[in-house]
Amino acid sequence: MIELKNVTFGYPGTMRDIYEDFSISLSENKIYGLLGKNGMGKSTLLYLICGLLRASSGKITVDGYDAQLRRPEMLREIMIVPEEFELPKVTLDEYVMINAPFYPRFSKDVLVNCLQNFELPLSLRLDQLSMGQKKKVYMSFALAA
């Protein structure tokens, strides 16, 4: 369950808050969509839920964990694929060897299956991919984690 209670957030230097006294409860085992125009706060909401941004007031919990604390127990349950990011200059196989231990439920079988669907080999170098391919790799890793 993801809960936001009376959350207020605005970026420093802006005149108004993006979220003001915002509350919502998202139940488990349901699929939700997040729709809106560019610049309306969709990514901001996801970053708040992941604890990557801090609300100026209110409380955000993921499965009962305070999102701002970014506890490992919470991070096992949630992953965000950011719009812009850099991947290291390693092969995907090396990336998996480095990062998979942080995700106890990581499944290499799931990763390989996702990559096959995207027609991407495990031996590819991450720094040589297009942004679209990098996002596919990141999403595959997220699903496997």
Locations of the language-model features?
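A short, flexible loop at the N-terminus of ABC-type nucleotide-binding domains that lies
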Residues: 1-21, 28
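Conserved ABC transporter NBD signature motif
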Residues: 58-66, 73-74
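ABC ATPase C-loop
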Residues: 143-144
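ABC-family P-loop ATPase nucleotide-binding domains
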Residues: 80-138
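The feature captures the beta-strand-to-loop junction immediately N-terminal to the Walker
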Residues: 32-37
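Helix-to-loop junction immediately C-terminal to a conserved catalytic motif
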Residues: 50
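Conserved lysine of the Walker
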Residues: 42
